[in-house]
Amino acid sequence: MTIVAFQGEHGAYSEEACRKHFGDDVMTLPCRTFEEIFSAVESGQADFGAVPVENSTAGSINKSYDLLLDHDLKVHGEILLRVRHNLLVVPGKTGEIRQVRSHPQALAQCESYLNRRKLAAVPWYDTAGSAKDLAANPVEGVAVIASKLAAEVYGLEVVEEGIEDMPNNYTRFFVVGKGEPPRSTRSKTSLVFAVPNTPGSLYHALGEFATRQVNLTKLESRPRRNRPWQYVFYVDLDGHWQEEHISAAIVGLLNRAAFVKLLGSYPAAPPLEQESIAGQSALLQI
């Protein structure tokens, strides 16, 4: 059975992402930190890890990108998870809600909902953790914001679904593992590089992709740790590194860059439009 490590308690959105990618029968391994995910995969305790790398509203998750640079694991896949926040209570305690607990980011993403109802927001260490703690120690007038999976895991009641302020709230995850993933018909490639601190160096580096018609879907700079005011550049592009024009672009980049690290070529997640259509079809069948 496949074992996948994730950060958080059982019922976390990261565990939901694991189930979406690997199926409901996957065995999941909760980890306290992102570092523990990488350690679990490297030690063989888990086959893969699911690491959040980007949120459609909050942007990139820098810690994850730093760990991808520091470790030798490869990206084996990506997951695009629609994050739907739900208001959960202990069954039988659906009276007046005065206080809502959750992770600070979840509270921020539901700020308008909470303000309209004049609910006091109380930060908690984890969305699923807030559900776990409330189930263990029920408190009158207290609810939590978490996933429907957390409600199932801890036996809580969903009072209201989809309370997030922005409905198109997605988190992108990388599936990390050892070795190279099998090649797929629709691939993406992620890499990181640095260029010499000279005029035009970044322009010429990116030109290796442009002249070969390689489509870059993401370009982001990050500070190089222990090297003030020096930067590395993270790139996502369409295609597999073994495709002739992409491998030629990477060879050209190697000749211009101070260093290049290939994070992996992996199956791309289904486009959001397809997921939206599938979701609408499912609603019509209800």
Regions found by a protein language model. Give the residues of each.
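Domain-level signature for soluble enzymes in the chorismate/prephenate branch of the shikimate pathway
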Residues: 1-286
